[in-house]
């Protein structure tokens, strides 16, 4: 049966007990309102560890002004049931005072230069500082051997990998594959913001990503690929933040079209901001 913990000393006692037994511990950080994509991360983590801790904490420092912190969906009972079914051993539920004992205004920030300053970093200034700050705190609280993050937040995963390497966290970072609905929409906690009319339109993001991949693969210039993608999304009713092709480290590719690339999209449909990506 899954254990639920709200006290840091109890969490550390549990994890330390596991480690004394020689068990590997994994962490799956979340903000709750969990779906199949989150549960797939628990199952991925289980392949690399003997015990899995998932955290649920809606982190105020990664939300910008006029974003959805206050109304971010919270579904604690369903989350607990789903985590238990997925094989999670412990649920860590810190409150704001535990996570930020000096208050958010005095929290020591962590910034990952370069990778956190482009794309989402330009659209949501300070977002990744909040992500790095809370993830580093979760790492210190749980002391995991392994941590799993979803590839849907491709840039977030890259930012966390950079932070872990630079700050020498002794933690293996796993990237979990994107889990999609039948029509291709990437699963996201924010999908429930979509209206009944918007929901079928939202699947166009994945269709456009596939078009970007196929067009780029036959040698279409990158600028032309990106312009066509933005136009297709706008025609479908989106307001586009970006639709780009990048190298895996999120730098801009040169003239060659060989090697690994990733197409990334962020766009708004009504009041809902959606992000997705496709590696190729």
Swiss-Prot record:
Annotated compartments: Cytoplasm
Enzyme class: ligase
Catalytic residues in the record: 38
One of the record's GO molecular function terms: ATP binding
Annotated beta-alanine binding sites: 62
Chain coiled-coil ranges: none
Keyword flag Cytoplasm: yes
Catalytic reaction(s) noted: (R)-pantoate + beta-alanine + ATP = (R)-pantothenate + AMP + diphosphate + H(+)
Binding site for (R)-pantoate: 62, 156
Keywords from the named record: ATP-binding, Cytoplasm, Ligase, Nucleotide-binding, Pantothenate biosynthesis
Sites where the protein binds ATP: 31-38, 150-153, 179, 187-190
Pfam family, one: Pantoate_ligase
GO CC terms, sorted: cytosol
UniProt pathway annotation: Cofactor biosynthesis; (R)-pantothenate biosynthesis; (R)-pantothenate from (R)-pantoate and beta-alanine: step 1/1
Cross-referenced PANTHER family: CYTIDYLATE KINASE/PANTOATE-BETA-ALANINE LIGASE, PANTOATE--BETA-ALANINE LIGASE
Subunit (UniProt): Homodimer.
Purpose: Catalyzes the condensation of pantoate with beta-alanine in an ATP-dependent reaction via a pantoyl-adenylate intermediate.
Similarity annotation: Belongs to the pantothenate synthetase family.
Entry protein name: Pantothenate synthetase
Gene that this polypeptide is encoded by: panC
């Amino acid at each position: 049966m899954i254990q639920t913990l709200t006290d840091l000393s109890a969490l550390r006692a549990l994890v330390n007990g596991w480690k004394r037994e020689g068990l590997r511990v994994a962490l799956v950080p979340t903000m709750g309102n969990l779906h199949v994509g989150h549960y797939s991360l628990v199952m991925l983590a289980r392949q690399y560890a003997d015990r899995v801790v998932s955290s649920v904490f809606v982190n105020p420092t990664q939300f910008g002004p006029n974003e959805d912190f206050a109304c971010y969906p919270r579904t604690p009972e369903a989350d607990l049931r789903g985590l238990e079914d997925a094989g999670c051993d412990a649920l860590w539920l810190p409150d704001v005072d535990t996570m930020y004992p000096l208050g958010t205004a005095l929290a020591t920030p962590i910034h990952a230069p370069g990778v956190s300053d482009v794309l989402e970093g330009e659209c949501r200034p300070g977002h990744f500082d909040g992500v790095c700050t809370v993830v580093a705190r979760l790492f210190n609280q749980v002391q995991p051997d392994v941590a799993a993050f979803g590839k849907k937040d491709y840039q977030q995963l890259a930012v966390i990998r950079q932070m872990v390497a630079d700050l020498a966290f002794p933690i293996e970072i796993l990237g979990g594959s994107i889990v999609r609905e039948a029509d291709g929409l990437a699963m996201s906690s924010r999908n429930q913001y979509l209206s009944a009319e918007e929901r079928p339109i939202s699947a166009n993001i994945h269709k456009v990503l596939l078009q970007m991949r196929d067009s780029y693969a036959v040698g279409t210039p990158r600028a032309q690929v990106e312009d066509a993608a933005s136009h297709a999304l706008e025609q479908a009713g989106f307001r586009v933040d970006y639709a780009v092709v990048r190298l895996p480290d999120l730098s801009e590719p040169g003239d060659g079209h060989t090697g690994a690339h990733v197409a990334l999209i962020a766009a708004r449909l009504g009041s809902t901001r959606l992000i997705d990506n496709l590696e190729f």
